Design a protein with these regions (language model features):
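Rossmann-fold NAD(P)H-dependent dehydrogenase/reductase core
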Residues: 1-153, 244-248
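A structural signal for well-ordered alpha-helical segments within the folded catalytic domains
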Residues: 53-56, 126-130, 184-188, 233, ...
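Short C-terminal domain-edge/linker segments immediately following a structured domain
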Residues: 54-57, 102-108, 174-181, 235-238
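Short aromatic-enriched loop/helix-cap "lid" or pocket-rim segments at secondary-structure transitions
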Residues: 84-88, 156-161, 216-220
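Short, flexible, mixed-charge acidic loops at enzyme active sites
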Residues: 88-91, 159-166, 209-210
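Alpha-helical membrane-targeting segments
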Residues: 109-116, 151-185
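C-terminal helical subdomain
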Residues: 171-220, 229-230, 237-245
Length: 249
């Protein structure tokens, strides 16, 4: 067991694993607990560290040691392209620069105002998805799939949401057509990410626009910025500024 928000814990856990890993599913994440915008010892917000930072350390260590067999799957979220009906704005940036993306990681994006935790979650997922697309271009011999499990009932994911949205997620959305599906459906999406050879490396798959269930589709048609290679590279750079400077082994 290790804490995906703590790079040192991830490295220690990986040292205990022998051999290669045929398929890696990076599903840990969430809304950052009770203090999502507080900073970890590494200088990242808890919500970013929980959703992205440890996964970066884990996957890139496996790649560096040539221990990833074939495929890595990162659990994305429709929040990365916006969920207006649930109060998640689509992430957007003024410059798309590494400097600007780095402000998401350290929380200074919201300096001088009240943080929007829903937006911060979508931003974190988006940066993780862009990083995976960057890796897909660097490692064409392996598959890097981003897959949202969709709005899945029966998990602990809503526990960190604000009370009104938490109550809606637990008791209202499961009864509204088009807003959620059962746990086994969400789990199957992640399994498909590992096993379905028709899924394209570097692509983010999630529910169609304006829904949170149903078939998983390529999100690039909904949010073209996902295919922006410069933005992908800037996301990778922003992440590694923190990892290189603040997370020694």
């Amino acid at each position: 067991m290790n804490d995906r928000g703590d790079p040192r814990s991830v490295r220690a856990g990986l040292a205990d694993v022998d051999g290669s890993i045929d398929g890696l599913v990076m599903n840990a994440g969430g809304m950052g607990g009770k203090t999502p915008m507080a900073l970890t010892a590494d200088g990242a917000t808890y919500i970013f560290a929980q959703n992205v930072l440890g996964h970066v350390v884990l996957l890139e260590a496996l790649l560096a040691e040539d221990r990833l067999g074939e495929v890595a799957v990162f659990a994305g979220s429709e929040a990365a392209r916006g969920i207006p009906k649930m109060g998640f704005k689509r992430p957007s940036f003024d410059s798309n620069s590494a400097d600007e993306l780095a402000t998401v990681i350290d929380g200074s994006y919201f300096a001088g105002g009240k943080p929007d935790v829903n937006l911060a979650y979508g931003q974190a997922k988006l940066i993780g998805i862009l990083w995976m697309a960057h890796l897909a271009r660097q490692h064409p011999d392996r598959r890097f799939i981003c897959m949202s499990p969709g709005n899945t009932t029966g998990t602990q994911a809503p526990n960190d949401l604000a009370l009104p949205l938490r109550m809606a997620a637990k008791y209202v959305m499961p009864r509204v057509p088009g807003l959620s599906h059962k746990l086994d459906v969400g789990a199957k999406r992640l399994v498909d990410g590992v096993t379905d050879p028709t899924l394209s490396s570097g692509v983010f798959y999630a529910s169609a626009a304006n829904t949170l269930k149903g078939p998983a589709v390529d999100q690039t048609d909904i949010f073209p910025d996902l295919a922006n290679q410069s933005l992908q590279d800037h996301a990778n750079e922003a992440i590694h500024r923190l990892i290189t400077q603040k997370t020694p082994a």
